[in-house]
Amino acid sequence: MWRLPGARAALRVIRTAVEKLSRAEAGSQTAAGAMERAVVRCVPSEPKLSLSFALADGSHKNMQRDQSEPLGRVLSRIATNALKGHAKAAAAKKSRKSRPNASGGAACSGPGPEPAVFCEPVVKLYYREEAVAEDVLNVDAWQDGAVLQIGDVKYKVERNPPAFTELQLPRYIMAGFPVCPKLSLEFGDPASSLFRWYKEAKPGAAEPEVGVPSSLSPSSPSSSWTETDVEERVYTPSNADIGLRLKLHCTPGDGQRFGHSRELESVCVVEAGPGTCTFDHRHLYTKKVTEDALIRTVSYNILADTYAQTEFSRTVLYPYCAPYALELDYRQNLIQKELTGYNADVICLQEVDRAVFSDSLVPALEAFGLEGVFRIKQHEGLATFYRKSKFSLLSQHDISFYEALESDPLHKELLEKLVLYPSAQEKVLQRSSVLQVSVLQSTKDSSKRICVANTHLYWHPKGGYIRLIQMAVALAHIRHVSCDLYPGIPVIFCGDFNSTPSTGMYHFVINGSIPEDHEDWASNGEEERCNMSLTHFFKLKSACGEPAYTNYVGGFHGCLDYIFIDLNALEVEQVIPLPSHEEVTTHQALPSVSHPSDHIALVCDLKWK
């Protein structure tokens, strides 16, 4: 999915060559002229560079030196380290004849029967076959392709090679659900890196096939690994893998070079999946990424872990849900599979924990070609992802509703109306809700841009007037972005608006105005009544219509989520059907073992007019 099929064979050849090279480098030098590696990490924003290499005596050296330091000082230090390393090796071997030192030092024969005294090796750095002057600064001396010579041993200098800075497998793995490793690279690119998956051999199974790298030898006498046929970043275990652990062998790359390979084993075995999920049938409509003229859009409140794990949630809100199905490790598997299966171009998520964004959503969706941005609210926040092959992020214009209302001149008139109602004003300014606004530009046609807004309005059933004011702030801000900053760009406004179609908020969005005598201005009683009329200039439509419900819990069900679109520029190509009522209620309500949230994702294909 992430590489062209025609390139698969070529990548396999490259991967094999890289592994052979790694195995050759891991051993001692066996041929004259063969070179070890000296890895240099030198970043302009940091005062020091690091130098890493292995001496032939087995010791590994990691040096931190000032970038502004003369090269000669480093070479002198390397010579001292090489001499010390050889002295330790010599002490372990009582008899040693006078001969060139394998670690770079030379044996200096003393008179009579006295043991040999070892001299510091000559240490030089060469670039393009010429010695680098010792007064050259480190930052300029250590170039990629240079050769470090310690005595008779030569090291090829690799400056800033691709390297993994973070590599993790999920803590909970289920058959039928994609395993998306969390990885971070320095000087590299996941798309240019190589991946190979292994699974634990079942007891009594045949030994691993010949040719498996020695670095992948069993971690214990009772463990052995067999190679799968998966050479991609993501691996989806089958039922045959249940009860087995997984291993990932990966090599970082940048399109031209490969860095040091790493491997990691899962801390858990593959567990059985839940069977059919509520989104499986929906995926039949979203098997492929849409063509360029379409924008598949998803809006989904994924239920923050900070709310799912409370005693109130377990005993009052979701008492019908199996406790393990509320655990984040379990739900993340379902969320990842559901979202990746939609093959969306734009995904707007609500109730996203910060750690879930960085540790779960980013690794999973990035592996499927999407990139994301995050906006924290208080305990959780909003996330917007976009398909990198279709869009690039042009700019972000996120706001906090209460901060914008208090300080942005754009909302001066609205604030002047609100201050006439002190009780209502106090409640509005206490709310932490935010608006995430991202301007995306088509990668195929730079003249096509789109404003994607994402929000989660105040939740309380009696907070209708608060949601009205929040929506007024949101629409004014979106108008500023889509008219003043980027004149004429269309708008997609997604979110959990906590408002059914019968509420004032929905009436305001669809009709463009709300009268001052609407009942929602007194949604929390006469004390907080704040009569005012509001208008906006957009012509908006709910792309997915008005479903019977998008939220279904034991004590409530109703339509709270919407994808509002700009009718002047966009039209609906298709709406992906929601799960059937039978699917939703199979386990009484949501969330459940087959559905990770108390909300249902909205999915539709939009088309430019």
From Swiss-Prot:
Localization per Swiss-Prot or TrEMBL: Mitochondrion matrix
Tissue expression as described in the entry: Ubiquitous.
pH dependence: Optimum pH is 8.0 for 2'-5' oligoadenylate exonuclease activity.
Alphabetical keyword list: Exonuclease, Hydrolase, Magnesium, Metal-binding, Mitochondrion, mRNA processing, Nuclease, Phosphoprotein, Transit peptide
Biased composition (Basic residues): 89-99
Binding-site list for Mg(2+) 1: 351
Superkingdom as given in the UniProt entry: Eukaryota
InterPro entries in the cross-refs: CCR4/nocturin_mRNA_transcr (IPR050410), Endo/exonu/phosph_ase_sf (IPR036691), Endo/exonuclease/phosphatase (IPR005135), PDE12-like_N (IPR048821)
Location of the transit peptide in the chain: 1-42
Cofactor(s) the protein requires to work: Mg(2+)
EC number: 3.1.4.-, 3.1.13.4
Residue numbers spanned by region Disordered: 89-111, 206-230
Primary localisation category: mitochondrion
PTM sites of type Phosphoserine: 217
Top EC group: hydrolase
Any GO BP annotation: cellular response to dsRNA
Catalytic activity: Exonucleolytic cleavage of poly(A) to 5'-AMP
Ranges of Low complexity composition bias in the record: 100-111, 213-224
Entries under SUPFAM superfamilies matching the protein: DNase I-like
Binding site for Mg(2+) 2: 496, 498
Active site residues according to the UniProt entry: 496 (proton donor/acceptor)
One GO CC term on file: mitochondrial matrix
Record-stated family: Belongs to the CCR4/nocturin family.
Known role: Enzyme that cleaves 2',5'-phosphodiester bond linking adenosines of the 5'-triphosphorylated oligoadenylates, triphosphorylated oligoadenylates referred as 2-5A modulates the 2-5A system. Degrades triphosphorylated 2-5A to produce AMP and ATP. Also cleaves 3',5'-phosphodiester bond of oligoadenylates. Plays a role as a negative regulator of the 2-5A system that is one of the major pathways for antiviral and antitumor functions induced by interferons (IFNs).
Record's protein name: 2',5'-phosphodiesterase 12
